């Protein structure tokens, strides 16, 4: 993170002409288990990672917000918080920031303007929530600068609202919530219905290894929407608000009445919810053998029932599983049709996992992977006062 801090400080001073007063960060995240459960009112188990979005900031006495984006060549966006805050077609990055500020104002928070320089190293397009980290770090920045009475959960909800309503992208609450509330050496069990969170301790030295297949994700939006509709149809047939409310026993009694495809989709969600709750118990007990079994079952369910994995992802999972055996777990993470796998790996095996994948994956698929070795880290907060 030290490079990021240096970059935002330097760009702040160069572009805005004086020194910032505060450094604030918010992390990206990876979901260890609980896939496609969020919009079914279910459970997820993400952790925050040591890839962050970092801000250098200072408050202004007037109503102007000026933002410098280090990652877009020190491009500047400027707006007045007393005027209508509008969507910028030609500056997509700026809309996340504008949306967060607009939503904070709509929620009744009072503050003046600010100068902000922002940079991040959360890989974009890898499904590690670079956009949520940006939304959360901006909310956190206004909290810090103006001592706002806002909870971490509300910073997360405000970021989700900005993405849904201002940016115009539908997302659940998981990404913002873990970025806002993460804890070092812990995952977070999130109930997507009640928004209750529970910190779940992880074995301290465990590495969280994320491997991007770099398989271009085709069809992902249309297939995602289809899966969502199939889940909603199943919930209607069971007469419940969401599949969260269906037990596997109820499912088995009624399975013959369901369309075969809808049945497979519903079975994934129902069993995945149970797995996620059990995974939190296994992780807390530091039972990596059971955690590994649950992650393997999750992957098989995504592959066979939800049908969202691809050959490249299945290949990566098998390669990693051969190395870690019962000492950790591995599965696809994210929306599917490409993207990343996540593995919980004992430190002694990290190099072997990397070496195996580097030696075999490209030969098997023709694609070159990207490997990120992470730890579970703290959520958003103040890094330093300058």
Swiss-Prot record:
Catalytically driven reaction(s): alpha-D-galactose + ATP = alpha-D-galactose 1-phosphate + ADP + H(+)
Which keywords belong to this entry? ATP-binding, Carbohydrate metabolism, Cytoplasm, Galactose metabolism, Kinase, Magnesium, Metal-binding, Nucleotide-binding, Transferase
Task: Kindly list the biological process annotations in GO that this record carries.
Answer: galactose metabolic process
Q: Name one GO molecular function term.
A: ATP binding
Site (Transition state stabilizer) residue list = 29
User: Any keyword ATP-binding?
Assistant: yes
**Residues that bind ATP:** 69, 125-131
Q: Which residues bind Mg(2+)?
A: 131, 163
Record carries keyword Metal-binding: yes
Please give the SUPFAM superfamilies that the UniProt record associates with this protein: GHMP Kinase, C-terminal domain (SSF55060), Ribosomal protein S5 domain 2-like (SSF54211)
Principal location class:
cytoplasm
Q: Where in the cell is it found?
A: Cytoplasm
Its biological purpose: Catalyzes the transfer of the gamma-phosphate of ATP to D-galactose to form alpha-D-galactose-1-phosphate (Gal-1-P).
**Protein's UniProt name:** Galactokinase
Gene name linked to the record: galK
């Amino acid at each position: 993170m030290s490079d990021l801090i240096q970059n935002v400080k330097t760009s702040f001073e160069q572009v805005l002409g004086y020194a910032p007063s505060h450094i604030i960060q918010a992390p990206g995240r990876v979901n260890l288990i609980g896939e496609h459960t969020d919009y079914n009112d279910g459970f997820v188990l993400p952790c925050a990672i040591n890839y962050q979005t970092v801000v250098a900031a200072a408050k202004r006495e007037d109503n102007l917000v000026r933002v410098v984006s280090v990652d877009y060549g020190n491009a500047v966006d400027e707006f007045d918080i007393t005027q209508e805050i509008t969507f910028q077609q030609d500056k997509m990055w700026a809309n996340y920031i504008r949306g967060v500020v607009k939503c904070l104002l709509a929620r009744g928070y009072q503050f003046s303007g600010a100068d902000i320089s922002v940079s991040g190293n959360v890989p974009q397009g890898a499904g590690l929530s670079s956009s949520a980290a940006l939304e959360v770090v901006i909310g956190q920045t206004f909290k810090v600068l103006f001592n706002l009475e806002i909870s971490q959960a509300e910073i997360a909800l405000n970021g989700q609202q900005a993405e849904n309503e201002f940016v115009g992208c539908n997302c659940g609450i998981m990404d913002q919530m873990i970025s806002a509330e993460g804890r070092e050496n812990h995952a977070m069990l999130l109930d997507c219905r009640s928004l209750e969170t529970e910190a779940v301790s992880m074995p301290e030295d465990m590495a969280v290894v994320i491997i991007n297949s770099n398989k271009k994700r085709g069809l992902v939006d249309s297939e995602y929407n289809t899966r969502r509709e199939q889940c909603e149809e199943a919930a209607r047939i069971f007469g419940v608000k969401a599949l969260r409310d269906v037990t596997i026993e109820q499912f088995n009694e009624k399975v013959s009445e369901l369309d075969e495809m809808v049945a497979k989709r519903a079975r994934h969600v129902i069993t995945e919810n149970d797995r996620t709750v059990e995974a939190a118990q296994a992780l807390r007990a530091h039972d990596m053998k059971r955690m590994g079994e649950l992650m393997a079952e999750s992957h098989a369910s995504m592959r066979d029932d939800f049908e969202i994995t691809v050959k490249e992802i299945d290949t990566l999972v098998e390669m990693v599983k051969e190395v870690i055996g019962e000492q950790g777990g591995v599965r696809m993470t994210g929306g599917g049709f490409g993207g990343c796998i996540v593995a919980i790996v004992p430190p002694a095996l990290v190099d072997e996992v990397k070496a195996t994948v580097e030696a075999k994956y490209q030969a098997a698929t023709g694609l070159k992977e990207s490997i990120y070795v992470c730890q579970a880290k703290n959520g958003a907060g103040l890094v330093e006062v300058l």
